[in-house]
């Protein structure tokens, strides 16, 4: 890992500190900033970045979209739930109501065995807590995983280490969360 620090943009979500706990198992220094309490110039360009889950929609996620726009070509970024929706919107995709809201449910995720899913069986079980989803996914983003209802569960940029997951790898209901984070941290 060339990067030794992680910046988490907290979108006022109760799962943010579950992400902190999961990332901390890798010995990385972590700083958490609320989405309206940090300026874009305060974020170092040599850190990993995680855009946390949160209530509402990406338009209510403070600095999150600006952080993605500024840093996606420079550092690895992982967006979780709302963070994935923000990534999609940065590239022109839309966020809409999910066909059926899914809150606190363990569902199967089917993936293509690449990048952040290396070494993880497909399908696997993951926790979902969302009423919104990415539809459509913006070009050039690539769909990596889907749920049984067809909702996109993971995306990535084809060139840069920019990833989004709709599910919650940090939840105790999710399998392989630690592997997903390790795979993300392997991008330096």
What is each stretch, according to the model?
Residues 5, 46-118, 125, 181:
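Cysteine-nucleophile active-site neighborhood
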Residues 5-26:
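Short, charged N-terminal beta->alpha structural module
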Residues 15, 56-58, 172:
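Active-site beta-alpha loop architecture of Rossmann-like, nucleotide-cofactor-dependent enzymes
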Residues 29-35:
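Short hydrophobic/Thr-rich beta-strand motif most characteristic of the beta2 strand and flanking loop
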Residues 38-46:
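Short amphipathic alpha-helix with an adjacent loop that forms part of the alpha/beta core around
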Residues 115-159:
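Catalytic beta-strand/loop cores that center a nucleophilic Ser/Cys/Thr
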Residues 123, 164-175:
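Phosphate-binding/catalytic loops
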Residues 172-188:
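Acyltransferase
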